[in-house]
């Protein structure tokens, strides 16, 4: 296919490819939950390889295993708009509650230092209406700056660079900060370079991979969103080579009867060839990918954007199920953060009549992550510090 035809083909295919790439997610979640997949006959994976790399000093679950700070503030949304100063105050309070520090700078400096390359892992997948909000990201950047972290140290990243751009994570909106994704498109709308390879192929690190005995097979529409097929999912060089530490900033939303928060944002954002993993290995992927060193040893903090979110129809954007949670969740323990986030979403689903009670299978990926030593899934062992500002 020549460049002109490829340009037209890929531009026309973009929306369809995105839908095709997302389709396995909806299929895997359904109205039940990813946790209700058959547990027998699971495909093999290389999870045993994760333990071969010694745990680093910042390894998950981080400085505060089992500790989660939740800050709620009804004033964080006014006339359907997020109030940035309120969000700033909520994040600041969550940092103080999490660390026990009295000064905000000292709280932040427990996790990051001048000179380090710091990645902000956002989630732009559902489009402008249901992505990590700019108000939350700007508040995090502002507080990092006040703590001595230069903008040149920061990278905002996710799987697909063009999705970041679509929702406003651009150089114009974030001057001095690198914006990058694994899967890329050039200024002409092309996914392929002059060498005939996807730009994304140059962004994956073939020395680091998650192998699963499930074949990834994609058509021409979908391949730019997957980078490669086969049984290997490669970690992005953004993680393995470009960054020292990660601050994970997912959005509070459901996925069927479970949630897609910290672990999912990390796992499916870190690797290529993910379409093959949803149907049979959704839970395993959420937990196991986070056990590999590029994720496990670099994620120092999770800040869940729970200002606006959804309680049904997720992880895609279905406006009839949007809601104002007016909440920030913070913790170093991604498993515990997900467990508390699940409780919040579950309470809303029960209030809306979608469920009468929780489903144990909805916790499956958290329980697997706990068994891998990544954090605390047992609610009775989580130290929840909850503050209501208004």
For each of these PLM feature ranges, what is it?
Residues 18, 22-26:
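Composition-driven recognition of long, low-complexity, acid-poor segments enriched in small hydrophobic
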Residues 1-17:
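N-terminal secretory signal peptides and thylakoid transit peptides that target proteins
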Residues 40-114, 125-127, 131-138, 142-390:
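Extended, low-polarity segments enriched in aliphatic/aromatic residues
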Residues 7, 28, 139-140:
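Compositionally biased, intrinsically disordered low-complexity segments
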Residues 25-37:
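Signal peptide processing junction and immediate N-terminal pro/mature segment
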């Amino acid at each position: 296919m020549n460049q002109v035809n490829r340009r037209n083909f890929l531009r026309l295919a973009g929306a369809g490819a995105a839908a095709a790439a997302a389709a396995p997610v909806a299929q895997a979640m359904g109205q039940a939950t990813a946790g209700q997949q058959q547990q027998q006959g699971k495909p093999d994976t290389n999870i045993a390889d994760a333990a071969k790399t010694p745990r680093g000093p910042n390894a998950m679950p981080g400085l505060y295993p089992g500790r989660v700070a939740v800050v709620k503030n009804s004033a964080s949304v006014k006339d359907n708009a997020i109030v940035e100063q309120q969000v700033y105050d909520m994040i600041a309070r969550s940092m103080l509650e999490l660390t026990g520090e009295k000064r905000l700078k000292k709280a932040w400096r427990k996790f990051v230092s001048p000179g380090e390359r710091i990645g902000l892992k956002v989630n732009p997948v559902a489009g402008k209406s249901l992505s990590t909000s700019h108000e939350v990201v700007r508040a995090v950047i502002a507080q990092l700056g006040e703590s001595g972290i230069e903008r040149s140290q920061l990278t905002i990243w996710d799987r697909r660079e063009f999705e970041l751009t679509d929702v406003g994570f651009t150089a114009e909106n974030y001057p001095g900060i690198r914006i990058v994704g694994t899967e890329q498109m050039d200024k002409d709308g092309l996914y392929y370079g002059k060498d005939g390879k996807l730009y994304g192929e140059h962004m994956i690190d073939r020395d680091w991979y998650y192998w699963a005995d499930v074949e990834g097979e994609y058509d021409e529409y979908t391949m730019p969103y997957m980078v490669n097929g086969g049984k290997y999912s490669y970690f992005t060089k953004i993680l393995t080579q470009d960054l020292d530490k990660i601050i994970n900033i997912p959005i509070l939303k459901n996925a069927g009867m479970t949630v897609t928060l910290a672990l999912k944002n990390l796992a499916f954002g870190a690797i290529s060839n993910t379409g093959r993993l949803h149907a049979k290995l959704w839970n395993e992927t959420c937990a196991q990918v986070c056990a590999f060193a590029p994720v496990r040893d670099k994620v120092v903090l999770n800040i869940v954007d729970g200002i606006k979110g959804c309680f049904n129809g997720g992880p895609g954007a279905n406006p009839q199920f949007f809601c104002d949670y007016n909440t920030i969740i913070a913790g170093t323990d991604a498993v515990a953060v997900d467990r508390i986030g699940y409780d919040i979403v579950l309470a809303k689903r029960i209030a809306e009549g979608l469920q009468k009670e929780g489903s144990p299978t909805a916790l499956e990926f958290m329980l697997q992550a706990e068994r891998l030593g990544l954090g605390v899934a047992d609610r009775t062992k989580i130290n929840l510090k909850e503050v209501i500002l208004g």
